[in-house]
Amino acid sequence: MRMVDLIEKKRDGHALTKEEIQFIIEGYTKGDIPDYQMSALAMAIFFRGMNEEETAELTMAMVHSGDTIDLSRIEGIKVDKHSTGGVGDTTTLVLGPLVASVGVPVAKMSGRGLGHTGGTIDKLESVPGFHVEITNDEFIDLVNKNKIAVVGQSGNLTPADKKLYALRDVTATVNSIPLIASSIMSKKIAAGADAIVLDVKTGVGAFMKDLNDAKALAKAMVDIGNRVGRKTMAIISDMSQPLGYAIGNALEVKEAIDTLKGEGPEDFQELCLVLGSHMVYLAEKASSLEEARHMLEKAMKDGSALQTFKTFLAAQGGDASVVDDPSKLPQAKYIIELEAKEDGYVSEIVADAVGTAAMWLGAGRATKESTIDLAVGLVLRKKVGDAVKKGESLVTIYSNREQVDDVKQKLYENIRISATPVQAPTLIYDKIS
């Protein structure tokens, strides 16, 4: 087989076979196929697309390019959730303990975040003492015992995806649905998931800004999962404004604690219940989505979700008393209110710009080397559709520097107020299974 023939085949709009896809991925991972040929193929895929079978074969070739995590010693169906990312997306912190409290095993591998705030691990590390440095055996034992544990990403998972992703980034071939779908699904499958729930975001703060693109990506990922024997369901949710109120690490942990008590922001709590009920249903702990949701609402009400969170934190060295006393979380030196300059209704909160403002305070990383300030961030006091009076707080800024004019300016530019009432956006657009 010659790579040039395969590039030509895809350029002319033909489907590649399983053997051809394996040849490409193995050769590229080993370094036998140079970047310039892989770039040409990526661009051919960008314009010509791939059918469902090719996309599934590409996914599995990337899974087999490196190590895979074996979770077979964990009892039950392992369901993983993936969000395509957004601002203030704390769902993992709530969903883990919430579904674990009704018996769904949560074996979560998480990363540290690049971007507006930290990743799940950074957020959890704002709990004093909490750590993810546990061995694979400890990880599996903890999940069997408490139904939940979180470990840092390790091992050589999907090296083909890492290499191809870096190449796509610099060759203008990121926005190809088969390439995005196979990239996301290969990571989830390599990490040992039996079933997968996807939260595909759409709107200005999302990677897929257009609803039709978001639907196409969701359908592609659900199709891959079902073709390779991993039951997969997707939800398409709104990211035109940040989710919940908190943007920042310790601030999001506090919001997660409130939500586990059933006292969280309405939109955030609803999304957690919808995603969670899909996880419980796929784990075969409930016979319908309605029954699953009822179980989760009960776990919030009777305190078992919160207790599971405490047990989880303590098992990994964390001070679980932060759950009852959030003042033990890292605290910012300065608390500054951003006041509304006029009466009216909040008409727009540009999610990614608000995320950038939180990052300027130190809540996120610009590069892998940056340090992160776990205490700082923003808490929205109003969401789209809310009425506001002049002088009322729009956002509370938690900062470790006194002077925050740059952050205020950014927020004023990106939180718009209209004289006439505004409808709050739809939270969930579609469900795909």
From Swiss-Prot:
Q: What positions does the entry give for K(+) binding?
A: G88, T90, L243, A246, E255
InterPro entries found in the cross-reference section: Glycosyl_Trfase_fam3, Glycosyl_Trfase_fam3_N_dom, Glycosyl_Trfase_fam3_N_dom_sf, Nuc_phospho_transferase, PYNP-like_C_sf, PYNP_C, Pyrmidine_PPas_bac/euk, Pyrmidine_PPase_CS
Q: Which reaction does it catalyse?
A: uridine + phosphate = alpha-D-ribose 1-phosphate + uracil; thymidine + phosphate = 2-deoxy-alpha-D-ribose 1-phosphate + thymine; 2'-deoxyuridine + phosphate = 2-deoxy-alpha-D-ribose 1-phosphate + uracil
Q: What's the cofactor?
A: K(+)
Q: Which GO terms describe its biological process?
A: pyrimidine nucleobase metabolic process; pyrimidine nucleoside metabolic process
Enzyme superclass (EC): transferase
Q: Which Pfam family, any one of them, does this sequence belong to?
A: Glycos_transf_3
Q: Which residues bind substrate?
A: R168, K187
The cofactor note from the UniProt entry for this protein is: Binds 1 K(+) ion per subunit.
Q: Does the keyword field hold Transferase?
A: yes
Entry binding sites for phosphate: K81, H82, S83, T92, K108, M109, S110, T120
Which residues are in coiled coils? none
Q: How does it assemble?
A: Homodimer.
Q: What does this protein do?
A: Catalyzes phosphorolysis of the pyrimidine nucleosides uridine, thymidine and 2'-deoxyuridine with the formation of the corresponding pyrimidine base and ribose-1-phosphate.
Q: Can you name this protein?
A: Pyrimidine-nucleoside phosphorylase
Q: What organism is this sequence from?
A: Geobacillus stearothermophilus (Bacillus stearothermophilus)
Q: Which gene encodes it?
A: pdp
